[in-house]
Amino acid sequence: MTHSPIKPEKIAATAAVALEQALVVPALFQREGIDGYKGAANDTINVKVEGVLPFRTYDWRSGQIGGPNPNGGVRKAIEFDDYAEKTVAVSFGGNIYSAVKLTDEQRDFDLGGWAKLMTKQTEAIGRGLEREAVNHLTRQDYSVTLGGAVSGRDLRRTLIRARDVLNKFRIPAEGRVLLVGTDWEVELLSDEKLNLASNVGESEAVSALREASIGRRFGFDIVVSQEVPGDAAFALHRSAFIFATGAPTVPQSVTGGTASHNGVAIRYIQDYDANYLTDRNVVNTYKGFRSVQDQLLGVNETTDQAFVSTYEHFVRGIKLDLAATDDALPLSSGTGSTPESVELAAITGVGAVGA
């Protein structure tokens, strides 16, 4: 009988594909690698964020220098702006793993090969990454929270309102997602005006993300997550959060391999404990998450000149609360307002007056 050993690289590659296809919430985030973090102090790199320049207009036929024109205008010198790029410190940290001991008897009589064990270990890592992604999603400070039980506004109009807010925040239309918990899913599927129930089960799923998708409405790909709180939903762009993974190096003293699939990396290593006649399998990945803040471009209504926001704002995502009877918007004035909320409301037109 021919002995055909399976290369560790193939095992790692299979695990990487399985892991990528098992993800739902992390799959909605923008992905990046870890090469830039290697060797960096405190596992932190400084990322330059491009600056924003305002446009300016010049008075037409404004007369001679220092002298008024017939309309009373004076020819003025043009204004020069300073261009600056901000530096943002981005930290990378975390190691999610699954380690299993496998006796000779288990390997030979119970599992019949490496495939079943690898599937289970990959599922474990997937659950860990899913939990981490949801934690970052739910702990983010959102500038806008829309109520799902606002008087006189059904769910359809709530989704339209979410679209309107992202439009006013100038978020690109392509790549928008509505991530919902299970309570939201029930309400959306039960709403005849949305007609989403007919989409469920239309096509064969090839990944957990596709399986979790229940339709597309008002520019949003609607995705369900059982990890997200049932009464919560998030309207966001896929670039709102960054999801980074990296495969640790395989030590020279053990058998192993690394692989990456669609930006999701993983390492597989194995050794044998002869004292106990036991295999030891370890599957792991480095991970990191962060949100993306933006500087905004506004226009002064008095001078009609553009300006760049003083503060950075998280505008690539908003929250929806199924039970809330009121919207929580940036306060433009009054009690509870902050310089950041006043600026955001002034630039975007999305805001409310405080008490």
Model-found features: residue ranges?
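Short alpha-helical segments and helix-capping/turn motifs at coil-helix boundaries
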Residues: 27-34, 162-165, 265-267
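Short, flexible loop/turn elements at secondary-structure junctions
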Residues: 51, 182-184, 285
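Short helix/loop capping segments that flank catalytic or ligand/cofactor-binding pockets
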Residues: 55-58, 187-190, 197, 290-292
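Extended, solvent-exposed, turn-rich assembly/linker loops in the middle of proteins
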Residues: 141-220
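Extended serine/threonine-enriched, polar tracts that run as long, contiguous segments within proteins
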Residues: 208-272
